[in-house]
Amino acid sequence: MLPDLVPPSYMGRWSGWSWAMGFAGGIACLLGALYLFIENGEAWLGLDIETLENIRATFVFTAVWYLVFSIPMFLRTPDIPKNDTPVGQVIQEGLQQLKNSIKQARKYANIYRFLLARMIYNDAIILIYAFGGIYAAGTFAMDESQIIIFGIGLNVTAALGAVGFSWMDDRSGSKKTILLSLMGLIIPVTAILFVEDIFWFWIWGLMLGVFFGPVQAASRTLMGRLAPEDKRTEMFGLFAFSGKATAFIGPKLLGWVTVLFASQRIGMSVVLVLLAFGFLLMLRVEEPDKIQQTN
């Protein structure tokens, strides 16, 4: 939807701002979960903390939150005119278009290189999201409240990073923003694998958050700039698919390495490998000339 909603010269900024808004929503949701369920679930809502009812209730809270704040988008965001083509025909035509694009892989080789790179480094980001809390609990003995507070801090720095780097995306290009962000992720992840003091875990962890937003926002912007106008829907479909297709590989690798070496630290090094591999693949992606603008 992004290329249809904003001018090309503002695509990077709006992508960054929207990610920042998402992180702001995450902060509010985490605060709600912390104070309503984790800290006061038993006293206020009668939840049994012995059976972890207060923890499980946060999943319901998150689902309701997601539903409620999706409604404005469905009601207010402009959409393309309605097409009366039967659903079955739409699916058939879409699959045929995808088949044709795969046959023309050489023509879209640059886009596929980007999708491959993004697939790899996005797996690393998914691992950080999924196992960061487990690592914090297992290695630094952080409890549920501390992990949620840490998550709030990560969302704050991620929102600031998404806003701060959004101008760089438009002025210097999405590829440079992605590469800088990946390097900005590699350095803190490396440090976190070696620090022993929880204070330094917090410092490096919050620094890690600064680059979460930019790498994701700039990836979306670059896809919007690389995709031909008549293939945007298809290419963004592949973009979404590339973010999910191999999402199971990272956790599997992390689990195997952790068990093999009996160490969470060594297991989390999988994140570093994926980030570095994604960085190297991104070097081969060619970006269209950046949009010239004076705003």
Predicted regions located by residue number:
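Juxtamembrane intracellular "pre-TM" segments in multi-pass secondary transporters
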Residues: 78-116
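Short amphipathic helix-loop junctions that connect adjacent transmembrane helices
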Residues: 130-147
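Structural signature of the two symmetry-related core transmembrane helices
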Residues: 176-191
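Multi-pass alpha-helical transporter architecture, strongest
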Residues: 65-76, 269-295
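A membrane-interface helix-boundary motif in multi-pass transporters
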Residues: 37-64, 256-275
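Helix-loop junctions at membrane interfaces in 12-TM secondary transporters
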Residues: 193-205
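Helix-to-loop junctions at the C-terminal end of transmembrane segments
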Residues: 160-174, 258
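Intracellular juxtamembrane helix-capping segments at the cytosolic ends
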Residues: 1-6, 214-227
